[in-house]
């Protein structure tokens, strides 16, 4: 049976504002959704994938890279020729992990179009704020001519508001190493997710650290994750707890031996919770937990 890797991440506390450059009138707005009956802010999976691709490119060449000067993506193999059945070319890590799609319309009437598609092996969920958005908005004023495209008429500042949210974000990933052309890339992906850094959407101006403060890995032969969005806000150390996950472990739905936990959430565990998690690997650091999860992958590969 295949080994599946699932992970739940939660970021440090930070302040999000002006994500994706959306506006409502003169208010720069955050993306929002209703979560458990309350309004929460959210960051798209594509924003996380974009940040991850940059990290991956620092480890080995990626097919798709972003040119900050031209503000456009560049492709080394736009035809994805390395993925043809008979090709012996080396594939790019981002294509292998994150997938691709290239569709072309029919060149002549009555002919069918073609598409080259690879589904992402590394699937990423949308990030959701750990706490509801309370409606915080700051008042700002842009000075006349603040940017070359700003309003040129008049000498008065231009007022605008900015929605902001002081919170943590949590998201999850799913990965089946055996589905990769190069299975060892699963280790690279986990390492880079644990050192992700800033994530923001289009025109995002805010700096928000998306490196996880706490993490839960599950390495299992079961196809169901059962740990996504496992974190809940808490007043204990680290600001989070894992009540729902602990119930699943206690009931036998998630075997403790399949889990690797790391970060501040471990420091906040009580004696009874540690007893429930007997058999799981507990690390006070995220990096140590990531290394432990990667070690399990490497042992499995052997």
From Swiss-Prot:
The recorded induction information for this protein reads: Part of an operon going from at least MXAN_7266 to MXAN_7259 that includes a CRISPR operon with transcription continuing into the pre-crRNA locus.
Question: Can you cite a GO biological process for this protein?
Answer: defense response to virus
**Gene disruption phenotype:** Essential for sporulation, decreases sporulation 100 to 1000-fold, aggregation is defective.
InterPro entries hit by this protein: Cas7/Cst2/DevR_bac, Cas7/Cst2/DevR_sub_I-B/Tneap, CRISPR-assoc_Cas7/Cst2/DevR
UniProt superkingdom: Bacteria
User: Tell me, what does this protein do in biology?
Assistant: CRISPR (clustered regularly interspaced short palindromic repeat) is an adaptive immune system that provides protection against mobile genetic elements (viruses, transposable elements and conjugative plasmids). CRISPR clusters contain spacers, sequences complementary to antecedent mobile elements, and target invading nucleic acids. CRISPR clusters are transcribed and processed into CRISPR RNA (crRNA).
> Any idea what this protein is called?
CRISPR-associated protein Cas7/Cst2/DevR
């Amino acid at each position: 049976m295949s080994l599946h890797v699932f992970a739940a991440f939660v970021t440090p506390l930070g302040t999000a504002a002006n994500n994706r450059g959306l506006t409502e009138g003169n208010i720069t707005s955050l993306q929002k959704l209703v979560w458990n009956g309350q309004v929460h802010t959210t960051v798209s999976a594509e924003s996380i994938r974009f940040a991850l691709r940059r990290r991956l490119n620092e480890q080995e060449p990626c097919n798709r890279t972003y040119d900050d000067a031209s503000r456009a993506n560049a492709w080394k193999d736009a035809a994805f020729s390395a993925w043809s059945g008979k090709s012996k070319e080396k594939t790019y890590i981002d294509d292998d992990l994150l997938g691709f799609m290239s569709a072309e319309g029919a060149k002549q009437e009555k002919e069918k179009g073609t598409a080259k598609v690879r589904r992402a092996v590394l699937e990423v969920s949308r990030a959701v704020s750990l706490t509801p958005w309370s409606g915080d908005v700051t008042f700002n004023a842009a000075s006349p001519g603040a940017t070359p495209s700003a309003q040129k008429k008049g000498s008065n500042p231009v007022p605008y508001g900015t929605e902001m949210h002081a919170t943590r974000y949590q998201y999850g990933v799913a990965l089946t190493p055996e589905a990769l052309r190069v299975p060892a890339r699963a280790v690279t992906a986990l390492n880079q997710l644990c050192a992700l850094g800033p994530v923001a959407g289009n025109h995002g101006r805010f700096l928000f650290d998306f490196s996880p403060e706490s993490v839960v890995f599950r390495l299992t032969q079961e196809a169901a994750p059962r740990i996504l969005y496992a974190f809940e806000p808490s007043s204990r150390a680290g600001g989070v707890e894992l009540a729902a996950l602990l119930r699943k472990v206690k009931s036998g739905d998630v075997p403790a031996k399949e889990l690797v936990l790391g970060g501040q959430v471990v420091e906040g565990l009580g004696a009874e919770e540690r007893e429930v998690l007997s058999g799981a690997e507990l690390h006070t650091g995220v990096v140590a937990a990531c290394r432990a999860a990667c070690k399990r992958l490497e042992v499995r590969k052997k």
